[in-house]
């Protein structure tokens, strides 16, 4: 038996103060009444569903880990192929850019683009950076740490390698 979970009354009555999913990065997946009429949220059916209850990995949020031995970035890019991704290091920043042209999906035509920029710790060995894309669409960018930082005043492209196994990133 399917039971729809109603959101708490205090979240429904906040109206325009409660974030809409209208500008989420999941374009083409359809909108709910709340997305178009947030000021009427308390009068709309209490059985609508909001995007804030999606899983972390489904939301495209990245995870950055920096421990004593290495620096790692996990980024969900399941809608992109390795050819759609560009990863480069410029000065002490890593820039990840993804773009695919318009293509058809279940809801019509869609094109996507994102740009993420992360500061590299000064003690990351920039000559040993690597980047891979798992079969489930998790991009993993990593680099070992060294005792003293290298001079990071140049730009260098980092190739994206495809892995056949799913990512080992946590699903939070």
Curated annotation (Swiss-Prot):
SS bonds (residue pairs): none
Main localization, broad class: cytoplasm
SUPFAM superfamilies the UniProt entry points to: HSP20-like chaperones
Residue positions where Deamidated glutamine is found in the record: 6, 50, 90, 147
Phosphoserine sites (modified residues): 45, 122
Entry-annotated residues carrying N-acetylmethionine: 1
Sequence positions that bind Zn(2+) 1: 100, 102
Localization of this protein: Cytoplasm; Nucleus
Domain of life the protein comes from: Eukaryota
Family stated for the protein in its record: Belongs to the small heat shock protein (HSP20) family.
Protein name, entry field: Alpha-crystallin A chain
Organism field: Macaca mulatta (Rhesus macaque)
Gene: CRYAA
């Amino acid at each position: 038996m399917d039971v729809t979970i109603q959101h708490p009354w205090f979240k429904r009555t906040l109206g325009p103060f409660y974030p809409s999913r209208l500008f989420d990065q999941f374009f083409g997946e359809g909108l709910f009444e709340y997305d178009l009429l947030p000021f009427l949220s308390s009068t709309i059916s209490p059985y609508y569903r909001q995007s804030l209850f999606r899983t972390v990995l489904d939301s495209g949020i990245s995870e950055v880990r920096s421990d004593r031995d290495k620096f790692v970035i996990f980024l969900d890019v399941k809608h992109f192929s390795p050819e759609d991704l560009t990863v480069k290091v410029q000065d002490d920043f890593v820039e990840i850019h993804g773009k695919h042209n318009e293509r058809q999906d279940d809801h019509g035509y869609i094109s996507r683009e994102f740009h993420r920029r992360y500061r590299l710790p000064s003690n990351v060995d920039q000559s040993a950076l690597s980047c891979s894309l798992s079969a489930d669409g998790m991009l993993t960018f990593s680099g070992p740490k060294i005792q003293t930082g290298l001079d990071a005043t140049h730009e260098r492209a980092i190739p994206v390698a495809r892995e056949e196994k799913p990512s080992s990133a946590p699903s939070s």
